[in-house]
Regions:
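Membrane-embedded transmembrane alpha-helical bundles that form the catalytic cores
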Residues: 1-404
Length: 404
């Protein structure tokens, strides 16, 4: 069952969370019941009529893959956490990181169309249908972030149960938002008062209503009356251009709607999962856009890839210019972001396209410091928003695979 994919999911989830909500209004929390309802929802999410054991839909291959994955990540993280005080070598860190990312890398390779007719099959089905699970990318982000923070020394304590709870938190399991371990545990430890929980519930209701508007009304109409008709003929320039607008708006309303649902259900647990979107199409430049679009992903890449690449190059003095090192870090950052989406050519080009936009904007910012604008008013602000919007939507056209 796809999280937030139909009304049945909402009904089952809300019924399952009813004791959580009642206890929340009383200013209490049952960690045991939270664990039970999480396990129940995980089994439901990964249930499958096709790929299962003993013809039991709730004993699915995806569920087994998820359990194996969680055990694998917990063993890796706890091993690194306990062995780090004795040996925090770079080689050990890299080894643990590679082993943590390995399941995701395998899934991305098996998903790729590069294999063509050479897809590996198992019992007359593609192997990818038996490997991996819904949300493996986002769960891997959590694990990798945690390993990095252990190396940095910012994580002082990890308990196995809290780690499992963090990795398998069902409201955000399929597509984020991507939370941080320290922030998650802080919310989990602090039980909100009855009044505080009422505020969380009111915010959750608002987000659920807005999410329905975004995902099930606006995104549905865009897909039905714009994207689907345009896909019938994308050979003309005008149709391709209109598809670019429609697809970009659909991506936002569909994913923003999902994110609102995920955050709302997190709030019902008393967990204030961070937001994912902040009016991204009002961005005045490409940097502003990535501070507004898929923010938890953007900030994850900024902290885990860009900043660490820049720090490494600075420490090793690989380049003389800090500006040049920053641009190389942008290139690394967005290249990895591209292949994270998939190893298809258009995903890689999408990542490199945004790297080029960042590097180009960096050059523009340096030039602008020496040549301050003569006019800066509402018109110039609106113009910058329009220009940024078109650069961004063209990137989404690349991302859609319809251009390449």
């Amino acid at each position: 069952m796809i999280p937030y994919g139909d009304f049945t999911f909402f009904l089952i989830a809300l019924i399952a969370l009813l004791p959580v909500i009642i206890l929340g209004f009383l200013g209490k929390r049952s960690y045991i019941y939270n664990g039970v309802v999480t396990a129940f929802m995980i089994v439901l999410i990964f249930s499958s009529d096709k790929h299962n054991l003993f013809d039991q839909k709730y004993l699915s291959v995806q569920l087994i893959s998820f359990i194996i994955y969680v055990v694998w990540q917990v063993l890796l993280i706890m091993f690194y956490y306990h062995s780090k005080p004795k040996n925090n070598s770079f080689s050990k860190f890299v080894t643990v990181m590679v082993l943590s990312i390995l399941p995701l890398a395998l899934v991305k390779v098996l998903q790729s169309t590069w294999l063509g007719g050479h897809q590996i099959h198992f019992h007359e089905s593609k192997l990818i249908e038996f490997v991996g699970f819904l949300g493996i990318s986002y769960v891997t982000f959590k694990s990798v972030q945690l390993i990095m923070e252990i190396r940095d020394g910012s994580i002082k304590e990890i308990k196995v149960w809290k780690l499992i709870q963090f990795i398998s938190f069902f409201p955000t399991i399929s597509s984020g938002p991507i939370d941080r371990y320290k922030r998650f545990v802080k919310d989990d430890k602090k039980v909100p008062t009855g009044n505080e929980y009422r505020e969380l519930v009111l915010k959750a209701i608002h987000m659920i209503m807005l999410g329905f508007l975004y995902k099930y009304i606006v995104a549905y109409f865009i897909n039905t009356y714009a994207i689907m008709p345009l896909q019938l003929d994308l050979h003309g320039f005008v149709n391709l251009w209109l598809y670019m607008y429609a697809y970009s708006l659909y991506l936002f309303f569909d994913f923003a709607g999902y994110s609102l649902f995920a955050i709302a259900f997190s709030y019902l647990f008393g967990i204030k999962t961070p937001p994912n979107f902040d009016k991204p199409f009002k961005a005045k430049n490409i940097k502003d856009f990535w501070n507004r679009w898929h923010m938890t992903l953007s900030f994850w890449f900024r902290d885990c890839i860009y900043m660490r690449s820049l720090f490494y190059m600075s420490r090793k003095k690989l380049l003389k210019s800090q500006f040049a090192m920053s641009n190389v870090a942008f290139l690394i950052n967005f290249f990895i972001m591209g292949i994270w989406h998939g190893i298809e050519v258009y995903y890689i080009v999408y990542g490199l396209y945004h790297a080029a936009l960042f590097i180009g904007y960096d050059y523009y910012e340096r030039w602008r410091k020496k040549h301050p604008p003569r006019w800066q008013n509402g018109f110039t602000t609106a113009l910058s928003i329009v220009i940024t919007f078109h650069f961004v939507t063209f990137g989404f056209l690349i991302f859609s695979g319809k251009l390449i």
